[in-house]
Amino acid sequence: MNQDTLHRYLFDNADVRGELVQLQDSYQQVISAQEYPAVLQVLLGELMAATSLLTATLKFSGDISVQLQGNGPVSLAVINGNNLQELRGVARWNAELADDASLTDLFGQGYMVITLTPDEGERYQGVVALDKPTLAACVEEYFNQSEQLPTGIWLFADGKQAAGMFLQILPSKEDHNPDFEHLSQLTSTIKAEELFTLDAESVLHRLYHQEEVRLFDPIDVSFKCTCSHERSAGAIKTLDQAEIEAILAEDGKIEMGCEYCHAKYIFDAIDVAALFANGQTSTTQQ
């Protein structure tokens, strides 16, 4: 089965909607960019699944960023995506991390910033504290604050695969919904192994075999980096001229690296001169 897909589903006999995402190749591309400690591999997987689930709730074309920051040994973990389910991500850390480190161990006094940037319209940003025991609970708190709709989030990752599930009461329905509470209890019985080995239809049947579930066509999820020659050239043009000359004098080139995919863009003295002369340059990617 394709292990990089998101499925939406509805319950015909309940005012509740759901999503299920399963990631493998895209997840591997994110965590293979650096030698991440095991705990960060898991965190990035959960963050990817959460971002995919969040993206599927958007009703516009545009971008989303889910960013974790704090004053702990991990200063940043972020997944960027868009309405096409194209994701990329990175984390930064400065100390050895235990495999069983908690969110507080990783980020100290941390917070999650979710930024929605529509192609048309105003940007929206929501901030919640990383003061819950799990990332899933923090994402649930975001929904409680932003949409004020009862929402359940389940996230899993093991360094090889990542997955997540989402349940939410349909808008305009009563906040107290016994169907939602019942379905949340059923969903809470899901095991990571089931999400990693079964297709979506089998997972939903195993969880909700007594419910009437309508499963929609899958949506592909992929890794896509937005780095380019042009962006790297633009970054060089923001540097001070003296700094550029010093780098060229010492190294003979300026090397721009992408921390998301580790692509390298190399500009020699001729490239840089052409860049400032007419805004164009020939560059080499390695």
From Swiss-Prot:
Tell where it localizes: Cytoplasm
Gene field: hslO
What does the PTM comment state?
Under oxidizing conditions two disulfide bonds are formed involving the reactive cysteines. Under reducing conditions zinc is bound to the reactive cysteines and the protein is inactive.
What is known about what this protein does? Redox regulated molecular chaperone. Protects both thermally unfolding and oxidatively damaged proteins from irreversible aggregation. Plays an important role in the bacterial defense system toward oxidative stress.
User: What biological processes does GO assign it?
Assistant: protein refolding
**Family label:** Belongs to the HSP33 family.
Keyword Disulfide bond among record annotations: yes
State the protein's name: 33 kDa chaperonin
Keyword Disulfide bond (UniProt): yes
InterPro entries linked: Heat_shock_Hsp33, Heat_shock_Hsp33_C, Heat_shock_Hsp33_N, Hsp33_helix_hairpin_bin_dom_sf
Q: What is the lineage of its organism?
A: Bacteria, Pseudomonadati, Pseudomonadota, Gammaproteobacteria, Alteromonadales
Record-annotated disulphide pairs: C225-C227, C258-C261
Q: Which GO terms describe its cellular component?
A: cytoplasm
Example GO molecular function = unfolded protein binding
Keyword list, A-Z:
Chaperone, Cytoplasm, Disulfide bond, Redox-active center, Zinc
